[in-house]
């Protein structure tokens, strides 16, 4: 009976460690996903700002030179 208790205790201990490691890894994966989403969002904002700035510069250049085509 004592041997059975030791075996069950060992299995419980190993299962607890395994579960803890899986939970920690899942938390790390969620952090990586959030970083990728932030990176994608910032990239979109940067591209939008670049396009708007280019359009504004073209409009100003057109008005200054007076050579606008419509």
Swiss-Prot record:
Spell out the residue numbers of the propeptide: 21-39
Disulfide feature: 62-68
Q: Which Pfam families match?
A: Antimicrobial_2 (PF08023), FSAP_sig_propep (PF03032)
Segments forming a coiled coil? none
Does the keyword Signal feature in the UniProt annotation? yes
InterPro entries, A to Z: Antimicrobial_frog_2, Frog_antimicrobial_propeptide
Tissues where the protein occurs: Expressed by the skin glands.
Its subcellular locations are:
Secreted
Tell me the first and last residues of the signal peptide: 1-20
Specify whether Phosphoprotein is a keyword of the entry: no
A GO cellular-component term linked to this record = extracellular region
Report which superkingdom the organism of origin falls in. Eukaryota
Q: Which GO terms describe its biological process?
A: defense response to Gram-negative bacterium
Q: Which UniProt keywords apply?
A: Amphibian defense peptide, Antibiotic, Antimicrobial, Cleavage on pair of basic residues, Disulfide bond, Secreted, Signal
What's the family?
Belongs to the frog skin active peptide (FSAP) family. Ranatuerin subfamily.
Tell me the function of this protein: Antimicrobial peptide.
Name-wise, this protein is: Ranatuerin-2Pa
Organism lineage reads as:
Eukaryota, Metazoa, Chordata, Craniata, Vertebrata
